[in-house]
Curated annotation (Swiss-Prot):
This is Monoterpene synthase FDS-5, chloroplastic. Residues 1-65 form a transit peptide. Condenses two molecules of dimethylallyl diphosphate (DMAPP) to produce mainly an irregular monoterpene, chrysanthemyl diphosphate (CPP) and lower amounts of a branched monoterpene, lavandulyl diphosphate (LPP). CPP is a precursor of the pyrethrin insecticides. When incubated with isopentenyl diphosphate (IPP) and DMAPP, catalyzes three competing isoprenoid condensation reactions, a chain elongation to give geranyl diphosphate (GPP), a cyclopropanation to give CPP and a branching to give LPP. It catalyses: isopentenyl diphosphate + dimethylallyl diphosphate = (2E)-geranyl diphosphate + diphosphate; 2 dimethylallyl diphosphate = (R,R)-chrysanthemyl diphosphate + diphosphate; 2 dimethylallyl diphosphate = (R)-lavandulyl diphosphate + diphosphate. Belongs to the FPP/GGPP synthase family. A motif (DDXXD motif) lies at residues 145-149. GO terms for cellular component: chloroplast. Its main location: plastid. Mg(2+) 1 binds at residues 145, 149. The gene is FDS-5. Dimethylallyl diphosphate binds at residues 154, 242, 281, 298, 307. Binds Mg(2+) or Mn(2+). InterPro entries: FPS1-like, Isoprenoid_synthase_dom_sf, Polyprenyl_synt, Polyprenyl_synt_CS.
């Protein structure tokens, strides 16, 4: 095997007194330490399919989650009573974990690949805590996105705001989730040299993401009046800002900062990651219509909500005048019969094939750019990111 990351199969020996964070127990000890095997000169370059964490990661990652959640619901900055504490705990459990946790895992994955040697207990804890910050951030984004879209399900269960006892309270809950990120950062990273850069990174990413959400929302107002306003360039702008920065760039940038790097030195890496992040969002557009809700845990509403998705933008690019007329008459209307007519046009234009062509070209171009980077460790990080997303619809 060219490269691997593994955790000892021996169970960790818990010793709270030796933990760099006295309030929690360590989940990685010196006897159960993350190790990284450097390829020798005779070995091939990193194989992204083998740079994965051990099967123990999920349970260890969740242990850190429980620690962070406990800290938040006992935050001395607010005087919790039983009702408020139970509400916040339930809300966190409902909205933060439960997905694939790709962003959170990517922080840990990437930091290990960059360091290239065993992690200390503190490093392992901090990498997971930072990973959870990206998951908390996503929960905030998704909670508000679901409300704005009028979505019904998320990750195979009703959206948080759809619960009878929640409703509009979810607006405040979303803001609370966003504030939790800063509470975690302050508690565990304030003394680090890169703390201010982490805060800036999350603040800038939030601005880009909610600005992208704004474009997505107001473009629908124009599209409802005149569908021809939609284009591939508009879709690209939406997916770049609404999802690419926080989905792909944020986790890797967190790992780079924790490793002591200056993000200004990684402009090329940022460009690659933003392109991959856009691919991730376009993949979501594809799955919204062509994915199985039972598999992906979400009922698609892009057609009904008149979104400027990759599919409608591509359809308008390929359609003849008659097909464009049908799309204009039926797109953006909450009527199953009209949604079906839009999907008929999608199938007639072979948008599945168009998406697969885009996906193949994206993979080839991204891999070429990744291999051009001078650092093998950075190549491994980028390849791992690409492989996690590639053909996620299969």
């Amino acid at each position: 095997m060219a490269s691997f990351i593994s955790l000892s199969s021996k169970s960790a020996s818990w010793n709270a007194s030796s933990c760099p964070h006295p309030s929690v127990q360590p989940f990685v000890t010196r006897k159960n330490v993350v190790r990284y095997h450097k390829p020798t000169s005779s070995e091939p370059s990193y194989s992204p399919l083998t740079t994965t964490l051990s099967s123990n990661l999920n349970s260890q990652f969740m242990q850190v989650y429980e620690t962070l959640k406990s800290e938040l619901i006992h935050d001395p900055l607010f005087e919790f009573d039983d009702d408020s504490r139970q509400w916040v705990e339930r809300m966190i459990d409902y909205t933060v974990p439960g997905g694939k946790m790709v962003r959170g895992y990517s922080v840990v994955d990437s930091y290990q690949l960059l360091k290239g040697e065993e992690l200390t207990e503190e490093e392992a804890f901090l990498a997971c805590a930072l990973g959870w910050c990206t998951e908390w951030f996503q929960a905030f984004i998704l909670l508000h996105d679901d409300m704005m879209d009028g979505s019904h399900t998320r990750r195979g269960q009703p959206c948080w705001f759809r619960l009878p006892e929640v409703g509009a309270v979810a607006i405040n809950d979303g803001v609370l989730l966003r504030n939790h990120v800063h509470r975690i950062l302050k508690k565990h990273f304030q003394g680090k040299a890169y703390y201010v850069h982490l805060v800036d990174l999350f603040n800038e990413t939030e601005f880009q993401t909610i600005s992208g959400q704004m474009i997505d929302t107001i473009s629908r107002l124009a599209g409802q009046k005149e569908l021809s306003k939609y284009s591939m360039s508009l879709n690209r702008r939406i997916v770049q800002y609404k999802g690419a920065y926080y989905s792909c760039y944020l986790p890797i940038a967190c790992a780079l900062l924790m490793f002591g790097e200056n993000l200004d030195d990684y402009v090329q890496v940022k460009d690659i990651l933003v392109e991959l992040g856009m691919y991730y969002q376009i993949q979501n557009d594809y799955l919204d219509t062509f994915g199985d809700p039972n598999v992906f845990g979400k009922t698609g509403t892009d057609i009904e909500e008149c979104k400027c998705s990759w599919l409608i933008a591509k359809a308008l690019e390929l359609a003849n005048e008659e097909q464009k007329k049908i799309l204009s008459e039926n797109y953006g209307i909450k009527d199953p019969a009209k949604v079906a007519k839009v999907k008929e046009i999608y199938h007639a234009l072979n948008l599945k094939g168009a998406y697969e062509d885009y996906e193949t070209n994206l993979y080839e171009n991204s891999m070429k750019a990744i291999k051009a980077h001078p650092s093998i460790a950075v190549q491994a990080v980028l390849k791992s990111c690409l492989e996690k997303m590639y053909k996620g619809h299969k």
